[in-house]
Amino acid sequence: VPKKIAVTYEDAHKVEPYNEALRMVGLEPVPIRAEDSVSLAGVDGLLLTGGPDVDPQLYGQEPLPETQKPDPPRDRMEFRLLGEALERNLPVLAICRGLQLFNVYHGGTLIQHLPGDPHRTKQRPPDPSQPLHEIRVTPDTKLAAILSDGQHAVNSRHHQAVDRLGNHIQVSAKSVKDGIIEGLERPDKAFAVAVQWHPEDQVRTDETQLKLFRAFAKAVNGGSR
């Protein structure tokens, strides 16, 4: 029986690539929206997905004009589920907005807008699987054990980024060109890994990105917990 993964989302169309990536590694996605008000009872891991900007009030700031309208119910749900997952030592994979929420949950702050949008593709129509820039993975991190350290090409579509780092977490990757944080993790947890790019869009074209989901599946199946 495949292990179940709670997948947070608000747009059924956008959640499908995450679900597909999980199925590729033998996991069963259980999509959850804010209005579902569920706990993690009966699931074996948590996937925090992309979406709108985290409410700046959660890190003590007023929104800038470029900041998207917040979705407080989703912020509250994901804070609650992340807290529950960390407390129970369930594997957590956080992607894009998920990484930003992971940092804010731990007391960190965000850069509300990267001027000039250096981390968003200018292509129209954009191909989400196309790499946009290089990251450098920090040696001796969980991410390095999964992807190997050194440089990797990743896709990118975010206009916010980690500013002040939260507590109990470490940086596992940075953008080569401008030093923007691209990976975070909790070293004291069996698997609590966050990435700023969208590996779910690259799993069919880049074996390296599939490794991230394979490692998540291994942790969920008891391999590194």
Placement of each model-derived feature along the sequence:
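Conserved G/P- and acidic residue-centered "switch" motifs that form tight phosphate/ATP-binding loops
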Residues: 96
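The feature captures the ABC ATPase H-loop/switch
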Residues: 99
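N-terminal beta1-alpha1 cap of cysteine-dependent amidohydrolase-like domains
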Residues: 1-93, 103-105, 111, 115-147, ...
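Generic enzyme active-site microenvironment
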Residues: 196
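Catalytic histidine neighborhood in serine/cysteine hydrolases
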Residues: 189-193
